[in-house]
Amino acid sequence: MGKITVITGGTSGIGRGIAEKILAESAKTDRIFVTYGHDEKKALSFQESLPEEKRSQVTLIKADMSYYEEMMVFVEELKKQTDHIDWLVSNAGISTYAKYEDYSFEEWTRIVNTNLSVPVFMVKELRSMMVEGGSVLFTGSYAGQQAYSSSLVYGVTKA
């Protein structure tokens, strides 16, 4: 039984770097499940960039983490494909650069859902699949420690 890693938002940026590092050090029996939100072209480009002998270890799953319902569809799909998780990396995140007074309630809610609420409930849903000694990682940001007026809501969710 190989190690199972789940990475949300794993086709670009920090998530992609984590996926590539884990894959580089993985055994042939290990698997990585990577979510992507909207950009299927970028997701396929990520998969094609992987070493050919490792590509079959990576499963891409479309899931917009700003919606609880899509996260639940992802969780159900994951449960069909594996019986355990060793590492869960909650990396999906979004931001809008705007002044506080320019945020709409809908935009604020979308960012909070993507960066905080949905990931917390995803961990709750996947908790029973986590192996003893497994790890959950939430990626944060320096913006969570140092306030920026242009990305207030992002900073709040990444503290």
What are these regions (language model features)?
Residues 40, 62-73, 105:
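The beta1-alpha1 cofactor-binding region of Rossmann-like NAD(H)/NADP(H)-dependent oxidoreductases
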Residues 123, 157:
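Active-site helix of classical SDR
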Residues 91-96:
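Conserved NAD(P)H cofactor-binding loop of Rossmann-fold oxidoreductase domains
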Residues 27-44:
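Conserved glycine-rich Rossmann-like NAD(P)H-binding loop of the short-chain dehydrogenase/reductase
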Residues 11-12:
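Conserved glycine-rich cofactor-binding loop
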